[in-house]
Amino acid sequence: MKLIVGLGNPGREYELTRHNIGFMAIDELAKRWNISLNEQKFKGVFGAGFVNGEKVILLKPLTYMNLSGESIRPLMDYYKIDVEDFVVLYDDLDIPVGKLRLRMKGSAGGHNGVKSTISHLGTQEFQRIRMGIDRPKNGMKVVDYVLGRFTSEEIPGVNHSIEKAADACEEWLNKPFLQIMNTFNS
């Protein structure tokens, strides 16, 4: 069984913001794999299905970004999901829009949703797909930037990174994460 989590904030006002690109990737996977995100439990919304013979759970924590681990850990405990069968998708300011970086482990890098996940799992050693949102320009505050919507110029790159993140998740169902890192980080 695999768990794929996209980080974001709940509520319509955050729907298409930069900080919610992880949620957008989960929506893409749900559409691709015909998985309904209709279960509400573990402080999140999730759905399960079978993809290429593998049971997959897709989760969007509804805790607000900074408390994401409060949703992830109880679901992992309930379904007895090992950390190596878990991947998290989230926004990253240090990566250009349209680009991805896959990592096997690491620090939170200033991302509060990842910080919460590390805190609740008790380890930094989990797989992640970092989706580029770039840095704010013209002195804009980071909080205003990540909670802002993508510009029309950014949308093609955003759609590309959502597609590539979904492709990476799909390959991960049948290949080691290290192998797909080599493919998608190049």
UniProtKB/Swiss-Prot annotation:
Keyword Zinc-finger: no
RNA-binding found in the keyword field: yes
Oligomer and partners: Monomer.
Signal peptide: none
Organism: Bacillus cereus (strain ATCC 10987 / NRS 248)
Task performed by this protein: Hydrolyzes ribosome-free peptidyl-tRNAs (with 1 or more amino acids incorporated), which drop off the ribosome during protein synthesis, or as a result of ribosome stalling. Catalyzes the release of premature peptidyl moieties from peptidyl-tRNA molecules trapped in stalled 50S ribosomal subunits, and thus maintains levels of free tRNAs and 50S ribosomes.
Record keywords: Cytoplasm, Hydrolase, RNA-binding, tRNA-binding
Source taxonomy: Bacteria, Bacillati, Bacillota, Bacilli, Bacillales
Annotated catalytic residues: H19 (proton acceptor)
Protein's gene: pth
Residues the entry annotates as binding tRNA: Y14, Y64, N66, N112
Full protein name: Peptidyl-tRNA hydrolase
